[in-house]
Regions:
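Beta-rich carbohydrate-recognition and catalytic domains
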Residues: 1-86, 94-147, 151-205, 213-263, ...
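Conserved active-site neighborhood of enzyme catalytic/cofactor-binding cores
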Residues: 269
Length: 302
């Protein structure tokens, strides 16, 4: 494990595999993690299973629990058919201050490139019921929205939302991150772009925030970036910083990649512990083109 001057840099070769893909080869993924520390001290993890196009795509979101952050027990599995969607992407799992849980589910509208975000609420993560789903981020005819990163801080919900333009059907892979706020985590006010692509750089095609850390000197974020349309779904990880949550500036990167396959290391999520330690979760490409889900622990800085 290395550390930049901002955030820990993952080392997939020494990390522990949390979940293997359910098939071999390109398009078979276990990943898109969203980690949360529960009031019981356990780690709760939402993630996504995917098959290739034509075989189900993102067919399930899973919620699991672990005492040690490495060995997980599945609590509930959410099937894409229960949401009437073509595919599920990375969920956002959050513990609600004062009690209760939410999972924000990214749903692909059948036959289109459009995405929306639904939310499920429950007293505990075993009780999520798709029949109670309601759409909180519908997107529109111009923009598909998915993969929210949601954080409660100082009495306000903060969100970093991945946006895809739909104006050019052959270029819907382009992406940027928009910032939003909410007093209740349900009704959102969307603000300006928090992080966009960097022309001519490794993230010129897209920039998607995957995890945000509040630091003494501002806000720090991991994000996924890609240079070309051909790199879609095989992103690398970079770091961005800002004095405001709604304006993040990319640092030179990428900072992390897989040593196997396409080199993709993406959707990094983390849990920060009270003692300053941190546990990372991320999706990593493998030699055969599949992706697995890995974790590693980062001890407190000295």
């Amino acid at each position: 494990m290395e550390e930049t001057d901002l955030l820990p840099v993952p080392d997939p070769a020494s990390a522990i595999v949390v979940q293997e893909p359910l098939g071999k080869g390109p398009g078979h993924w276990a990943g898109g993690p969203s980690a949360a520390l529960g009031p019981d001290g356990a780690i709760y993890l939402g993630y996504r299973f995917r098959r290739p196009f034509g075989e189900g795509r993102g067919f399930a979101n899973v919620v699991a629990r672990s005492e040690d952050g490495e060995r997980f027990e599945t609590l509930v599995t959410l099937d894409r058919k229960e949401f009437g969607c073509e595919s599920l992407e990375r969920p956002a799992l959050v513990a609600v201050p004062g009690g209760g849980w939410r999972i924000y589910v990214s749903c692909a509208t059948p036959g289109t490139y459009h995405w929306r975000v639904d939310v499920l609420e429950a007293s505990d993560p075993t009780s999520f019921d798709p029949r109670s789903a309601r759409t909180v981020l519908p997107g529109d005819e111009h923009t598909g929205v998915k993969d929210p990163v949601i954080l409660w801080h100082e009495g306000l919900w903060h969100m970093w939302l991945c946006c895809h333009p739909l104006d050019e059907p052959d270029h819907t892979d382009r992406m940027w991150t928009r910032y939003g706020t909410s007093v209740d985590g349900i009704d959102w006010d969307l603000h300006d772009t928090a992080l966009g692509p960097t022309p001519g750089q490794w993230d010129a095609r897209g920039a998607r925030v995957s995890h945000v850390v509040v630091a003494d000197d501002g806000w720090r974020a991991y994000y996924d970036g890609r240079a070309t349309a051909e790199d879609n779904a095989e992103e690398l990880t970079g770091v961005a910083v800002g004095t405001s949550p709604g304006h993040l500036v990319a640092r030179p990167g990428p900072v992390a990649a897989s040593p196997w396959g396409s080199g993709s290391l993406r959707y990094l999520s983390g849990v920060e512990f009270p003692d300053g330690g941190m546990r990372l979760y991320y999706e990593t490409s493998l030699r055969d083109g599949a992706h697995d889900l890995r974790t590693e622990y980062v001890p407190p800085s000295r």
